[in-house]
Amino acid sequence: MAPRKGKVQKEEVQVQLGPQVLDGEKVFAVCHIYASYNDTFVHVTDLSGRETIVRITGGQKVKADRDESSPYAAMLAAQDVAEKCKSLGINCLHIKIRATGGNKTKTPGPGGQSALRALARAGMKIGRIEDVTPVPSDSTRRKGGRRGRRL
């Protein structure tokens, strides 16, 4: 038998995802926070909005359905998003916060504020904060009937 040849060592090339940047350089992305009364989405895209970088919801972070929209679930989701963004080299975010809108409520749910605060506390620099809730110019009829919702 012929003598065994030694294993050939393959060089492992470090693959770095995200943009190649210098230290201290600001790399922006857009964070779309959709805060309804049932769930909170924290969705980071590139500046054009076409390419999703990371998307995490409050429902992915908690077990109970009633806690999906809670500030705590939104905070956990935002912390995960910030961690993923930092690993990709993104250190600055423009924020677009959105409520359900249309002929439904135009105020963001309870998780919107805490998601924004969690992103800032996690070390992400905040660029612009914008409310992008869809507001109807003239809408379909709102739920509740002629005499409205009676409490």
UniProtKB/Swiss-Prot annotation:
Example GO biological process: translation
The organism of origin for this protein: Procambarus clarkii
Keyword Ribosomal protein: yes
Record-level GO cellular component terms: ribonucleoprotein complex; ribosome
A Pfam family hit: Ribosomal_S11
Protein name as annotated: Small ribosomal subunit protein uS11
Stretches with biased composition (Basic residues): 142-151
Region (Disordered): 129-151
